[in-house]
Amino acid sequence: MKFDTVIMGGGLAGLLCGLQLQQHGLRCAIVTRGQSALHFSSGSLDLLSALPDGQPVTDITAGLDALCRQAPEHPYSRLGAQKVLTLAQQAQTLLNASGAQLYGDVQQAHQRVTPLGTLRSTWLSSPEVPVWPLSAQRICVVGVSGLLDFQAHLAAASLRQRDLNVETAEIDLPELDVLRDNPTEFRAVNIARLLDNEEKWPLLYDALSPIATNCDMIIMPACFGLANDTLWRWLNERLPCALTLLPTLPPSVLGIRLHNQLQRQFVRQGGIWMPGDEVKKVTCRHGIVSEIWTRNHADIPLRPRFAVLASGSFFSSGLVAEREGIREPILGLDVQQTATRAEWYQQHFFDPQPWQQFGVVTDDAFRPSLAGNTVENLYAIGSVLAGFDPIAEGCGGGVCAVSALQAAHHIAERAGEQQ
């Protein structure tokens, strides 16, 4: 099977890369093993929240300039501030075109409220998520009886520290009892599958309506809206106060929705989606990827003109830690890492951990190297890249988006030259 590009990994980076390549008229396939890290995320995307020295970032342009000085090997630093902002804006346009109407500005970070009621700087958020400063003084944090994925009293306690009048309440929906037989089934995603049925919408409205008359804003867990935000908008039009949603413990309704919107758009535009499959071997001849062998296709290789590695980091098995060191399991690409295991981590758990910055070594075009030699038609994007700390620096989503589009543009340019 011949393709212009085969992408190994169907997470945020892989999907955005595929969508951008389709804009250039290239035929793409995505091989994906299972759920991506988006399923376990908040559904919000960070661009740059903090510098390596710990200084918080609000002005993104100034932050990117400072990052170039502090971390010259960071994926952003390799591109330059203006290029990062341009690619981030293009990514936001792609996301909106896919139906993910995310709120945010590439020039200025905003503060979203977290499930614990604290604030976190971010780039893009779903319109349901409350953003600081809140537009209300009287707030009620509402939990769902029996739902362990969200603790209303913890969020309320944090918000009270910001001089807000915050109460808590709990709604009980007997219609959800069918899920209570097994505690592991009473999760936000399973509740959403039930409540998203239009016949159930009035039940949720009836439960929230008495609470809404005594406050200016309701904050509740994101336990509906798995496909779209239609129910949220329907409730906001009818309730006498604003309704906002907070992501819950994973799996996350907002994260799954974002992934599904991107995946559906990729397929709608003619992309080949290969779920439940796994790349077992890549044939590389004279520094060029010629064949990709997958578990489900056995002796039928995929033959791409270009290949993209978007396999993620440790969480997605894109990187594997062993006693001898860190390795990239598909091709055995060169990996940036510390010399000894003792240097992998810091003693204090909440300190920035060195292992977070481990990843494949690439050139400035994000082409990785194998035994010191660049693989000419292979690009590495997203969390598998080295040189950045997605947690401490708050840049995970941004690096995925920016590197994906940079690789896509580079591939499209080279593909045009070869025709």
Swiss-Prot record:
Pathway: Polyol metabolism; glycerol degradation via glycerol kinase pathway; glycerone phosphate from sn-glycerol 3-phosphate (anaerobic route): step 1/1. GO terms for cellular component: glycerol-3-phosphate dehydrogenase (FAD) complex. Its EC number is 1.1.5.3. This is Anaerobic glycerol-3-phosphate dehydrogenase subunit B. InterPro entries: FAD-dep_OxRdtase_2_FAD-bd, FAD/NAD-bd_sf, G3P_DH_GlpB_su. Its cofactor is FMN. Belongs to the anaerobic G-3-P dehydrogenase subunit B family.
